[in-house]
Amino acid sequence: MSDQFVSQSGRTLSEFISRFQLQQPQPGSFSANSHHAAVLIPIVCRPEPTLLLTRRSDHLRKHAGQVAFPGGKADPQDSSLIETALREAEEEVAIPASAVHVLGQLAPLDSSSGFQVTPIVGLVPDNITFHGNEEEVAGLFEIPLYEALRLSRYYWLDIHRGGVNHRVYLSWYESQFIWGLTAAIIRRLAQQVNI
């Protein structure tokens, strides 16, 4: 672990890193879903650490206008899902892959669009200028890490779709509505570090 990440962001980020590393995720349950994707959970190392999130462009075919982490489908040339997440983050929000300090990954989650999505947790220095790829990203925003990890901010709705019951998580931050897979990923991270 580079001292720059800890010293720039203080004790609270060090505590998060320690808890994350001490409580590694349990292996996910088997899924017959053979389509793989990965997202980067970018933790920006500010004096008060933040999560960087995107609002997807309104013209996209899937998940248009939704809040999401940068990420996408694994390409055949990707050597790992970590590489997938880093490649997508560079394409979508201009985070150089070389600038990300990967802490680890969470267990995969199944998406409503048929992908098994693996969240990759990474630290990003605060001196990077983030800008969204206009074709994919309508906007960027940050939420304080410890606000995002407060479990009491997440609500759920049980829905019946396609003959199957699903629990959908949702939350708000200022004017941003965070729901679905993105809310489920943040909630899972919060459960793992138990802050």
From Swiss-Prot:
Class of this enzyme: hydrolase
All copies of domain Nudix hydrolase, residue ranges: 34-165
InterPro entries: CoAse, NUDIX_hydrolase-like_dom_sf, NUDIX_hydrolase_dom, NUDIX_hydrolase_NudL_CS, Nudix_NudL
An example molecular function term from Gene Ontology annotations: coenzyme A diphosphatase activity
The encoding gene: nudL
UniProt cofactor(s): Mn(2+); Mg(2+)
Protein name as catalogued: Uncharacterized Nudix hydrolase NudL
Gene3D superfamilies: Nucleoside Triphosphate Pyrophosphohydrolase
Span(s) of short sequence motif Nudix box: 72-94
E.C. no: 3.6.1.-
Keyword Membrane carried by entry: no
Chain sites annotated for binding Mg(2+): E88, E92
